């Protein structure tokens, strides 16, 4: 896991000390190198995850749109069928009464 920003800043401030021993300077630089590697790795993982989720979201939007269109067509067909049923129930008596 990458270093927290405060930890990273502490290491950088430590490196500014001109009296810092070479071994400590090497260790601090190594920590920064490892931190950078883990940061890049985590960034790449998150980018891949984001791309995957974005693609899944797009697929779901398309599927949802298709379902809404299908439901809309089904509802319209039911309304048309109800209208047809109503028109078929008119009897001669109904016509004579009008």
UniProtKB/Swiss-Prot annotation:
Assembly and interaction partners: Homodimer. Interacts non-specifically with DNA; probably binds DNA in the early stages of DNA packaging.
GO BP: any one term: virion assembly
GO annotations of cellular component type: viral scaffold
Family of the protein in this entry: Belongs to the phi29likevirus scaffolding protein family.
Function: Scaffolding protein involved in the icosahedric procapsid assembly. Coassembles with the capsid proteins to form the procapsid. The scaffolding protein is found within the capsid as a serie of concentric shells. During DNA packaging, the scaffolding protein molecules are released from the procapsid.
Coiled-coil intervals, chain numbering: 40-62
Disulfide bond entries: none
Alphabetical list of Pfam families matching this protein: Scaffolding_pro
Recorded consequence of changing residue 56 to K: Forms procapsids which have incorporated the connector. Defective in producing infectious virions
Molecular function GO terms recorded: DNA binding
Alphabetized InterPro entries for the sequence: Gp7, Phage_phi-29_Gp7
Keywords: Coiled coil, DNA-binding, Late protein, Viral capsid assembly, Viral release from host cell
Protein's name according to its UniProt entry: Capsid assembly scaffolding protein
